[in-house]
A protein has these predicted regions:
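Metal-dependent phosphoester/phosphodiester hydrolase catalytic core
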Residues: 1-253
Length: 253
């Protein structure tokens, strides 16, 4: 976990950046004069139906040449992954190459060897930053590495109500609950590759595992009594703002 104090800090948000497609958005983003950018997953499209990682290596090599130098060299970068940079479309914890994919992800984003992510499973992390005397804690989740199998067919997934089914896995859950309940931040921003509040579509979302979603929303509700809670999500190739009582979710994709 890192901590720092800054003034007038500005974040950009985004997800789903195919290395083989046009990226004409960057000049417009540069005009925003950002201090940091948060990549919310599918930061490359390197997955194959077989799950093998030969395309992933190529995808990262290409993306390294596509991402603007002013962004990668001058701005703070935070990143989580989703299925296409995890290595298997809609993949989860049973993906056999996930350890290799994790190493490729950490190397691409220049995560230091001293970072906790280098010494445990999963790419989840947290960062505390004091911005204009407001303490902001950013919590990045890994919704892939530990996730149970989806139920139903692709693009028509059903709710998996098995009490043993998980998105985050036991260790990440313990870390998340401890992080949130012991936080002294004014604002907590949760980064999740898949949507939390949206339920009215047949694609991947927290509601595919309703008990996990319930647990997360109860944790957020408990924390929101004293902390402003916000989530940022991706995946959907669209943008939106969702609200549940005092909890706001922003989808940027």
């Amino acid at each position: 976990m890192s901590s720092s104090k800054v003034y007038g800090y500005k974040y950009g948000l985004g997800s789903c950046l195919d290395q083989d497609r046009e990226q004409s958005i960057w000049p417009s983003i540069k005009k925003e004069e950002l201090d940091a950018f948060i990549f919310l997953g599918d930061n490359v499209y390197g997955d194959l139906p077989s799950g093998e990682l030969s395309k992933m290596q190529r995808a990262y090599q290409i993306q390294k040449t596509r991402l603007p130098q002013w962004l990668m060299n001058e701005k703070e970068i935070l990143a989580i992954w989703d299925d296409h940079d995890f290595g298997l479309n809609d993949g989860g914890g049973d993906y056999p190459y996930k350890k290799e994919a994790e190493k490729m992800f950490l190397n691409f984003w220049n995560i230091p060897q001293s970072d906790p992510r280098r010494n445990r499973e999963g790419i989840y992390f947290k960062q505390i930053k004091e911005i204009d005397d407001v303490k902001v804690e950013i919590i990045g989740l890994d919704t892939r590495y530990f996730r149970s199998k989806l139920k139903g067919k692709k693009n028509a997934y059903e709710r998996n109500e098995d009490s043993s089914a998980t998105i985050l896995g036991q260790d990440q859950w313990a870390w998340l609950e401890s992080s949130i309940l012991n936080s002294n931040a004014d604002i907590i921003v949760i980064l999740s590759s898949i949507q939390i509040l949206a339920t009215n579509h047949p694609y991947e979302k927290w509601d595919n595992f309703p008990l996990e979603r319930k647990r997360l929303l109860e944790l957020i509700a408990r924390a929101s009594r004293k902390i402003t809670m916000v989530a940022i999500t991706g995946d959907r190739h669209k943008s939106g703002i969702y609200k549940n009582e005092n909890f706001i979710e922003i989808t940027a994709s």
